[in-house]
């Protein structure tokens, strides 16, 4: 029995290891290709180790386009992601506090509608949102990428924080009120410190999603100098001429990190 278990364990670990190699191979290939001359990337696609290591792709990629360095694109991404994340965490925490601690008419219906909104594909809302933002004069700016997140539009984070707050004993709220705390004081001095894990989790996920967002930036940002990194990477690909895949791989590694 012990030998059979040992054999099964060995086979299991070998299969998991092989599956892990298959999953990580594209990433390793991209990293190694970033050190190859662009002209040889696909000629030597079957070989991971470059014949000659070169940092030319990193230098050319960082130079950017039309006198706009890639540092500008990184700053744009950082600004958009940070601002949207702050808005998401703040508004979601306030909305979650309302759902978890207050009773009001239509609460269950509103909470259910919020959960149902999580099941809607983003493409369903794309056209009406674009028309609305166009009427507001926001197209061509960062406003559509930042402002909506200050209104708790992502139900996942509201749901996450609401569950955290529901797990906090109401006795703490009552004790704080006896000491003279208002609802706002209870929220800021009692609730927020106790849901730090949820706030950090929400902040990390929100920042990652906004950092990787490509479609929204493609729709609303129309000046290359204002592109985030996710959108600037496509400038390396030119269907009408040659594409600088080496520089694109190099900058993608920087974006992913």
Model-predicted segments: where are they?
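A structural signal for multi-pass alpha-helical bundles of membrane permease subunits
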Residues: 2-255
């Amino acid at each position: 029995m012990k030998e059979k278990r040992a054999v099964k364990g060995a086979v299991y670990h070998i299969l998991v290891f092989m599956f892990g190699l298959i999953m990580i191979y594209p990433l390793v290939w991209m990293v190694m290709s970033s050190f190859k001359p662009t002209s040889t990337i696909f000629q030597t696609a079957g070989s991971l180790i470059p014949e000659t290591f070169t940092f030319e792709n990193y230098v050319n990629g960082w130079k950017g386009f039309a006198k706009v360095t890639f540092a500008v694109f990184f700053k744009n991404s950082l600004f958009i992601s940070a601002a949207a994340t702050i808005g998401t965490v703040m508004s979601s925490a306030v909305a979650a506090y309302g759902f978890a601690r207050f009773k009001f008419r239509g609460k269950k219906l509103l909470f259910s509608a919020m959960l149902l909104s999580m099941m809607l594909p983003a493409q369903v809302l794309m056209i009406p949102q674009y028309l609305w933002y166009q009427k507001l004069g926001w197209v061509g700016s960062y406003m559509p990428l930042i402002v909506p997140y200050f209104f708790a539009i992502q139900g996942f984070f509201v749901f996450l924080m609401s569950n955290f707050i529901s797990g906090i004993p109401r006795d703490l709220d009552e004790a704080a009120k006896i000491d003279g705390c208002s609802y706002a004081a209870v929220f800021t001095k009692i609730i927020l410190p106790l849901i730090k894990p949820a706030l950090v989790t929400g902040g990390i996920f929100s920042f990652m999603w906004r950092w990787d967002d490509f479609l929204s930036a493609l729709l609303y940002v129309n000046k290359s100098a204002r592109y985030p990194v996710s959108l600037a990477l496509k400038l390396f690909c030119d269907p009408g001429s040659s594409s600088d895949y080496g520089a694109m791989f190099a900058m993608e590694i920087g974006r992913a990190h």
